[in-house]
Structure formats: C-alpha cells, structure tokens
Amino acid sequence: MPPPLQAQRLLLSHRRLPSPHLRCFTAVSSLPSAPAKTVAAAAAHAPSSILSIRESLLSGERTAAEITAEYLSRLRRTEPSVRSFIHVADAAAEREAEELDRRIATEGLDAVGPLAGVLVGVKDNLCTANMPSTGGSRILDGYQPAYDATAVRRLREAGAIVVGKTNLDEFGMGSTTEGSGFQVTTNPWDDSRVPGGSSGGSASAVSARQCVVSLGSDTGGSVRQPASFCGVVGLKPTYGRVSRFGLMAYASSLDVVGCFGSSVVDTATILSVIAGHDKMDSTSSSHDVSDYKSELVPLDLLESKPLNGMRIGIIQETLGEGVETGVISSIKDAASHLEQLGSVVEEVSLPSFSLGLPAYYILASSEASSNLSRYDGIRYGRQVSGDDLNELYGGSRANGLGHEVKMRILMGTYALSAGYYDAYYKRAQQVRTLVKKSFKEALERYDILVSPAAPSAAYKIGEKINDPLAMYAGDTMTVNVNLAGLPALVVPCGFVEGGSAGLPVGLQMIGSPFSEGNLLRIGHIFEQTLQNYSFVPPLLAES
C-alpha cells in the first residue's frame, strides 16, 4: 500500500490517445498542494463529523447543548457574510439539545437515535412544522406548515436538530441563489462569488460549518453544482430513493431530495436515514435501503489498488467547448488518480448528451407551469387587491413571484399549448428517452461515469444574472442525470485560481439506478486518498 501522504499528494495528469471517441488516461504528474491558508484553516477548524459528535456524547466530553452552542456561535459570526439561512431556529435548537441531553442521561445514547446532537440545515422548499417554509418566494411569505416533510421527519426521529431553513433560488429555479425572494447567499470561499444553486444556502452552510449536514433538492443539478462551487460533498439519489412528500414541487418527474456533508461518510449516514419507501409519496421506491456508512472502507484498511478491476467512463462531451481549462485539468487529474487506484478509465461519448439541456428546460418549465398554479396569494404572501377574483390572483402572482419564475411559467405554458405541444413538449420527451438509453448503454460497459459537476468554478455575483442563456448553460453537466433518473455524487477534487485561496472544483460520479452504495464507496476511497474533506474555506480562519 502506498504511504498515505503520497496518496494524498498524487493526482495524475493525462495523455490523450488518438481515437476521437475513446481515450485513456495515464499517470504522469502530481496533485498541487492545497493553498497554505486553506491548510492553516483546516488545522484550526477541524470539521466535526457525525461520528465525532457521537463519540463526544458517548464519552461525556461534550453535551448536545454544548455542541449546539458551538455551531450557533459560528453561525452568528459567519452569517452576516454568508447569508445561508432565511430563518434560524436558534432558540428551538437550544431547547431540543437540552431535551436530548436529558434523554441521554436517563435512557442512554442509543435511545435517542444515530444523529443525536447533529445540527441540520433544511432547504426552505422542504416543509417543516412550526417553522416558516417559503420556497424562497414572497408569495409564500408567512407560510408555516403543520407537518414535516418525510425527509425532515426521519432526521428528527433519528435525533437530528434542525437549526434553520436555508436560502434558495425561488422554488428551486436558478443556479446561483441570486433568485431568492429574500437575500443573496455568498460563497464561503469568496464572498464576492455565488455559491451555486438552487440549493446554495444548504451548500454554503455546510461549507462554512454553520451546520454539520444539510438537505437540498435537485431537479437539474441543484445539489451537485453548489457542492462543486462550495467544496463540499453533494448527493443526488436515484429518483424515488427518497420521499418527495413535503417538498414544494417544481418539476415532479425530475425533483429529488438530496443532501450535503463535509465528507462522504456524513453524506452516507444521512442517506441511510432519509431513504426508503413512503406511503405518502406514490413515486417513492420500495427498493431495499442499505446501511451505506457500514459499506465504506477506512483508509488504513484499503488495498494498494482498491479500485482494481473497475471500469470508469469519463463523458467526452463534458470536456469540450464551454468548459473552463482549469476545470478540465482538475477532472483529468482526478480521472488519472482513479486510474492509479486500480481502475481502467476511458473517455466515452454519449451522443445524446448535448440534447439534454434544451429538453430539460422545456420539460421542467412545463411541469412548473402546472405545479405553481396552486399559489394565489389568498391565505399568505403578498396579496394585491382587485375588483374581482381574477384581478386579485393576477396581481398577487405578479407581485409575489420573481422574474425567473414568471419566465419559466411562460415558457412552460407556451410549450404545452395546443399549437406547440408536438413541436416542443412531445419532442423533449422523446429526447429524454434517448438520454435514458444512452446512459443505460454506457453503464452496461462501465461501473460509473464521471464528469465535471459544472463547466466552471464559482463566478462573481451579478456576472450572469442578466444572461439567462449563460446561466442555463451552467447546468449542462447535471440535467441529463435528472432526465435519466440516476444517482450522482459530487466530491471535491481540486482547485482553480480565484479568490484568496483558490476555488473548489467537484468531480461528478454517476451510477446505475439505486447504486448509491457503490458511488459512496468509490467517492470515499477517492476522498480519503486526497483528503479533500479537510479543506475548509478561508472564511473560517477569519471568523
């Protein structure tokens, strides 16, 4: 087995073979060292994992109340800069932590669940009882559900403490979190840059260690792109793996509840809790749920070639025009590192890949035009008076919904209209079938497929807000996975220049339906041999 330090340092570059459709990578160079400031921050602010929190509670070293106080203190210091949360439930979190401590003292740690004392951020399009749930929209300002979304309920039952509701692009429609009806979230690596979206608040909260883990939703990349931008782990499960009950619908055939963590182990732990069939969601699967964390192998038990015999395909269409040079280099280095770990890595073409983006926006907007028709401004949100019901509805929607949401509703209504249904919606569904077929055929040849999670690192706030086509192009790497209903994991794999300490880049790993366990196992091996999970943003060194 190679020495751990050597394994941490070695990321390998590539050599292209002549075939335009199939290329292999060979190991020839090394991973750049992490920026000095980043390493210093990591030493000063070691991330508290789910396991370390549980060990602290078990040993009596810290109480749930003390852990909660530490996280809330950090949240208060960093939130004025990051603005990850729409609502912080600090008093409720403190009460829940004190109650946990009482139960631990009388019933024991096992009785309170595997996530006892773990602070969780919840994207604000997931319903939470006794806590505002706005979907990032002013049309739901003041809405407070009487129930928890299934994913939230399962976390609470496992002992987790919901610290608050994280910011998002309105109803999940956006890629920067600039589209929120409440505030603009910033990237903890550089507060002049976007955290990605639409789950930007959930990603930035984990990156800034304001909470241990967080929930997001992914309709076309809304977990994976922010994970890449913020340097955290993000998981989009298979469609149906996690219940959508209590998730405010954007595009029902594409929406998935996902999660963020500062490590693959934490992400796997959360998935084990929230996954599984739910009678409240007719699309949820009854496929068996594994104890995903128990399937992960620690670094000291890894073989010298832990991925020996595995075949990995790197999607050719994700390394071409429109992708930043630094991102391509990071992904090729990561692919070469996977090869060094024993796998065979080949570049493979998916001919229908480029068709996915326009098909996605037609389908997602069409479903949104139906799903959002339920919001009328009558019981909550911004209500505008009118002479009749139609004027009241129209005025309230015009005043309560943001520009991007209105634009997508119009696009979807147009695509569904009688004169254009066949030309747009029906054709987009045919493209979706082609995309599914392409992935199915590729995943019959390869164990997983890999690509960048985004064509760039995090860009400046305001840089693309007035250019919707440029914004939509940022989803190129991710939307096809939603069209195919597949699971995907994003793990930090390197840095590009930018900010004071570099900007993170994420590697997207894509698997067959319900292969989350395999993705997490590969991601964990990759993560351990690079130690990316110990990289924390400069914000924490400064706060």
Swiss-Prot record:
Secreted as a keyword of this entry, yes or no, is no
The cross-references to Pfam families, in alphabetical order and at most eight, read: Amidase
Gene3D superfamilies on file: Amidase signature (AS) domain (3.90.1300.10)
List the EC numbers from the record. 6.3.5.7
SUPFAM superfamilies, sorted = Amidase signature (AS) enzymes
Q: Does the keyword Amino-acid biosynthesis apply?
A: no
Which superkingdom does the taxonomy of this entry point to? Answer: Eukaryota
Tell me where it mainly resides. Answer: mitochondrion
Gene Ontology biological process terms, A to Z? glutaminyl-tRNAGln biosynthesis via transamidation; mitochondrial translation
Q: Name one GO cellular component term.
A: mitochondrion
**Where is the protein localized?**
Mitochondrion; Plastid, Chloroplast stroma
Give the record's keywords alphabetically.
ATP-binding, Chloroplast, Ligase, Mitochondrion, Nucleotide-binding, Plastid, Protein biosynthesis
Location of the active site:
K123 (charge relay system), S198 (charge relay system), S222 (acyl-ester intermediate)
Record GO terms (molecular function): ATP binding; glutaminyl-tRNA synthase (glutamine-hydrolyzing) activity; hydrolase activity, acting on carbon-nitrogen (but not peptide) bonds, in linear amides
Q: Which InterPro entries match?
A: Amidase (IPR000120), Amidase_CS (IPR020556), Amidase_dom (IPR023631), AS_sf (IPR036928), GatA (IPR004412)
Q: Which reaction does it catalyse?
A: L-glutamyl-tRNA(Gln) + L-glutamine + ATP + H2O = L-glutaminyl-tRNA(Gln) + L-glutamate + ADP + phosphate + H(+)
What subunit structure does UniProt give? Subunit of the heterotrimeric GatCAB amidotransferase (AdT) complex, composed of A, B and C subunits.
| UniProt record similarity statement | Belongs to the amidase family. GatA subfamily.
Role played: Allows the formation of correctly charged Gln-tRNA(Gln) through the transamidation of misacylated Glu-tRNA(Gln) in chloroplasts and mitochondria. The reaction takes place in the presence of glutamine and ATP through an activated gamma-phospho-Glu-tRNA(Gln).
- Give any extra note attached to this record: This protein may be expected to contain an N-terminal transit peptide but none has been predicted.
User: Can you name this protein?
Assistant: Glutamyl-tRNA(Gln) amidotransferase subunit A, chloroplastic/mitochondrial
